[in-house]
Amino acid sequence: MTGGVGISYEFAKFSVIGFMLIGMFFVGFTRKSWPYILFMVLLTPGILFSAINLDYDTNFLSAISFNLSGPICLAITALYCFKRKITRERFEHILLAILLPIISMAVYLFLYTPNIRDVLSGTHSNFAASGGYGPNQVATVLGLGMIILFGRIITIKSRFINILDLGLLAFVSYRGIITFSRGGIVTAAVCAAAFILVYFLTADRREKSTLLPRIAFIAGVIMVTWLYSSISTLGLIDKRYSNQDAAGRVKEDVSTGRAELMKTELDAFYEAPFTGIGVGKVKEFRLDSTGIESATHNEVSRLFSEHGLFGLIALMVLVTTPLSLIFKKKQSPYLVTFLLFWLLTISHSSMRIAAPAFIYGLALIHIIHAKPRTIIHRK
């Protein structure tokens, strides 16, 4: 986005892997996180079949790195984070550390992208409004910022911080909406609803009494932000979310081609249901069968097609392992929220960026309340 030279877009994923390995070197990881070791083992047969099935002119290492850097990043992060105890205050500091770069990105988009009316060309995703980077990925990250800001407004009991976060929520939401990429924004809305539900079920009576006014303020801010976005885009954003083109005609495919990509990946799974067709092979399979040259947008169907039965078991490991944490009494609402963010994001944007992998790991953290220190007074 900023025109950086020499830094790969995979840098973030490998950085997360590196930091997590350093953390495990110093403090280790719990034995109960063994399912994520199993997850990595289940990915290895796909590498073997990739070496057998990939075309001769395909760069084997690039294909493996592009498709497995995300899952490996997730597994390493989960190994480190699973049931790791952390205080609520420290967890909020981590969320703030995630939020601040997202705000910086939103400010960059505000300063260095053209006026949205100057780059309107229809109801498709807008690269110019996304800083020249993938609108899907930009909207995903901005959606993550919206989720964190939403959680802060609900949980932090400070009027000044709440007002500041409401303003930032409006700003980040606006920048996310005008990318014209729906995935990240819809994901943020679903995750916010899940956060409210879990918070309401686990909060005490005093916390519940403050919930409704806060939700009302947030709803008002979002409505005003959407109205401003609609005016700024001359109503095209309304047509985008109504699945219409600029002329107001309803589009046949609400998934913008993702359903066709998913269909070819499932066809590949039916062709080799036990072994899969090999890591990175689905792109070649799609080109041969449909003439469409496109990477996957759905990590779930990619696991099925490229890893076969091993991919199905691997997905079951990722879904079922956190279930042991969900039903614990007084569980943090961030657990369900972050798991939903991971699942919805990999379903529309695969694992192009490190965010879904890292956020999945954060969902596994065990948040505890810090005990007040006992002060010993000397006579």
Region spans (language model):
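Transmembrane alpha-helices of multi-pass inner-membrane enzymes
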Residues: L335-L344, S350-K379
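Hydrophobic transmembrane alpha-helices and their immediate junctions
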Residues: F200, E306-W342, A370
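Membrane-interface helix-loop-helix junctions at transmembrane boundaries of multi-pass membrane enzymes
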Residues: F25-I37, R152-L166, A203-P213, P322-T337
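A membrane-periplasm/extracellular boundary helix in multi-pass inner-membrane enzymes
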Residues: F110-T113, Y199-G248, L266-E271
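Long extracytoplasmic/lumenal interhelical loops at the membrane interface
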Residues: V119, S125, A129-G131, A246-H307
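Alpha-helical transmembrane segments of multi-pass inner-membrane proteins
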Residues: E92-V119, Y133-T202, L325, L339
